[in-house]
Swiss-Prot record:
Homotrimer. It holds the Pfam family NTP_transf_3. GO terms for molecular function: glucosamine-1-phosphate N-acetyltransferase activity; magnesium ion binding; UDP-N-acetylglucosamine diphosphorylase activity. Acetyl-CoA binds at A356, N362, Y363, S381, S399, R416. This is Bifunctional protein GlmU. Residues 248-433 are annotated as: N-acetyltransferase. Catalyzes the last two sequential reactions in the de novo biosynthetic pathway for UDP-N-acetylglucosamine (UDP-GlcNAc). The C-terminal domain catalyzes the transfer of acetyl group from acetyl coenzyme A to glucosamine-1-phosphate (GlcN-1-P) to produce N-acetylglucosamine-1-phosphate (GlcNAc-1-P), which is converted into UDP-GlcNAc by the transfer of uridine 5-monophosphate (from uridine 5-triphosphate), a reaction catalyzed by the N-terminal domain. It is found in: Cytoplasm.
Amino acid sequence: MLSVIILAAGKGTRMHSSLPKTLHTLCGEPMLFYILETAFSISNDVHLILHHQQERIKEAVLERFKGVVFHTQIVEKYSGTGGAIMQEDKTPILTKHERILILNADMPLITKDALTPLLKSHNNAIGLLHLADPKGYGRVILENHQVRKIVEEKDANDEEKAIKSVNAGVYLFERKFLEKYLPKLHNQNAQKEYYLTDLTAFGINENEKIDAIFLEEEFFLGVNCQTERAKAEEIMLERLRKNAMDLGVVMQLPKSIYLEKGVSFKGECVLEQGVRLSGTCLIENAHIKAYSVIEESQIVNSSVGPFAHARPKSTICDSHVGNFVETKNAKLQGTKAGHLSYLGDCEIGKNTNVGAGVITCNYDGKKKHQTIIGENVFIGSDSQLVAPVTIGSNVLIGSGTTITKDIPSGFLSLSRTPQTNIENGYFKFFKKS
């Protein structure tokens, strides 16, 4: 077994946001949560190093992960990646296991499989990337597949900057190695910080083996600005789309479809172009038509759209919800709502038809109220149901009706102003003075 230390103490100033960098999301999930999931997939001892907005990050983490060990970096005394794992006396933080994997919190694309080459090493090891454009990364100087030196870009000379082998920001150390060399770290560099990479110099001077393990670039993309966040999100989206299609989901123009990590699919599903699925959603044996938005909802044995919007807590089963229909906190069972309706805070029974322009008026300016509609109900176009109201089963509501009172089962309900036809009314209205 091994312990995992995740470095998350930085300010993330290049994000230009009051939100901590690691809480910025990819596909609906904070970046930090991805790396924590990976950490717990390989270890039962996960440590998180915090400083900037640490209480905010800790609160978010504890809502999802209960086994994290939190530490506060002593930034005022020990800044930098090396300082992050130091205690007051410069010894490494306490861990359960002798092998320690160190990861950066701003690398949300790392997976267990991507780390496998590094974890197979029996020595101290550093993950490397070979980049065509290594700008922004620390350079790694190798000799016989062993690390001889790591130079941060800020401290590199022109010859060192030409090297394409760069530090991936992933380290595997034995605890005894850290105990021996961490107290020797100093901050005599351009940034006045303690660098983890400097540990290699101490080890090399005493003939310690430090393996250079090349890793796949896609999995170790660091996120330091909004442009990099967007790039990482597109990679994550490609993974989610592929996973869905591997389950048999049909996607029309996949690159136009957005879905988040909490979306799950069952049975035969079709997603047309421009569909957006966000939050925790279940899509089961469903056809989501073009440019529809589904949020925190369940769509089962149903068709939705095009241009429909299922807002949170919508459960649509054995139903058809057509174009420009919006639902919110709605339960539809065997319902047809073809077009241009708002169905909020309602329950609608089987074999009910909702005409065009029907609105459940759920808000009175102070509180939300519920509309209950039974089975075998026909609601004519352009009707308003003013909640709270209950419509029984086998009810017919005429077009243009405003319902303010409960309707018993078996009734016909109408509320219309009588129509008046005035002979020659057109000519009288437009008569010239």
